Structures are given as C-alpha cells and as structure tokens.
Swiss-Prot record:
GO terms for molecular function: NF-kappaB binding. GO terms for biological process: cellular response to tumor necrosis factor; symbiont-mediated suppression of host NF-kappaB cascade. This is I-Kappa-B like protein G2. PANTHER family: NF-KAPPA-B INHIBITOR ALPHA, NF-KAPPA-B INHIBITOR CACTUS. InterPro entries: Ankyrin_rpt, Ankyrin_rpt-contain_sf, NF-kappa-B_inhibitor. It comes from the Viruses. Suppresses the host immune response through NF-kappa-B inactivation. Possesses ankyrin repeat domains required for NF-kappa-B binding but lacks the regulatory regions required for dissociation from NF-kappa-B and degradation. Therefore, prevents host NF-kappa-B release and subsequent activation. Belongs to the polydnaviridae I-Kappa-B-like protein family. Coiled coil: none annotated. ANK repeats lie at residues 56-88, 93-123. Keywords: ANK repeat, Host-virus interaction, Inhibition of host NF-kappa-B by virus, Repeat.
Length: 168
C-alpha cells in the first residue's frame, strides 16, 4: 500500500533516545503487524536499518530475542524476510541471536533458530564461546548450584559435622 502510493518514505536518520531506528523500535515495542507494515517500505536504499546498531550495540534481531518472549519467532521471520542477519553479532559481547536465546533459556526459540538453514551454530562470541559452550556452562552452573544447596541442607540436617562424602 504505502510503497505503491508513489510517496517516498524517509526512514533514515530518525532515532529515539535509545538510538533505535524504526526497525529497532518496532522490534522492541511493536507487534508482528507493525513489522509487516515496515516490510512494505523496506528497500535497497534503507535495508541497512535492519543491520544498524542502536546505543546498546544491538541490531533489531538481538532486540527481538532479548525482549520478546511471546512473538520472537514470528517477528524474526518477518525481519529475516526483509534482510536482517540471523547471525549478526551484537557489538558489546559478540553474541548472535542464537547465543542470546541459549543464554535466556528460550528453548523454543533455540530450537527454531537451529532449524534455519543459514544459522551458524558454531559462531564464537567475543569470549570465544559458541552457543553450545554457553548451554554447557549454564547446565554446569545449575548442577553446581543444586549440589551446593544439597550440601547446605545436609549441614543443617546433620549438625554433628559429618561429611557428606563419608556417608556415601
């Protein structure tokens, strides 16, 4: 509709106080319908908006993964159709959308991302970690925390000072 109206839509140069352009803003605040409307006016002259970084050093794909727990997959589909980079790295940590989805324990999104043909599952962030490395670390932390909690409870239940390993 808008693109066929004959009007030239200017999308460049408009930033909010977060450094969000319109693609960032709709990724954060909008819904899927807003992104579909944006898709109508994205062209080769302004496609860079999908790859630009905001003041938090994130592209629109990172914003969706980090901030939308309900419609992330639907929004990402539209953004990717417009030309967003599924393997784009945020500038502050070098994390890709897959790194961020793993870090936030968003299993459904991780599974969907891993099925995308162009996804780089072995991308390294600035800490030289793959998404798989992050998943393993998070599991190990959970296990370690569970063991530490068990040790605390054992000491409460056995104040005599007996060591947990002595009873095994």
């Amino acid at each position: 509709m808008l693109a066929k109206s004959g009007f030239k839509i200017v999308l460049n140069g408009c930033l909010n106080d977060r450094g969000d352009n319109l693609a960032h803003y709709f990724s954060r605040q909008g819904d899927v319908i807003d992104l579909i409307a944006l898709k109508e006016v994205i062209n080769d002259d302004n496609r860079h908006l999908l790859l630009d970084y905001n003041f938090s050093q994130r592209q629109c794909v990172h914003i969706v993964v980090c901030e939308d727990k309900v419609n992330a997959i639907k929004k990402l589909k539209v953004l990717l159709e417009m030309g967003a980079d599924i393997n784009g790295q945020e500038r502050k940590g070098g994390n890709t959308p897959l790194h961020l989805a793993v870090h936030s324990n968003n299993y459904k999104l991780v599974k969907w991302l891993c099925k995308q043909p162009s996804i780089n599952k072995t991308a390294l962030n600035y800490a030289q970690k793959t998404p798989h490395d992050i998943a393993i670390e998070r599991i190990e932390k959970k296990i370690n925390n569970a063991l530490m909690e068990q040790k605390k409870w054992y000491k409460i239940m056995h104040p005599s000072g007996a060591d947990l390993s002595e009873e095994e």
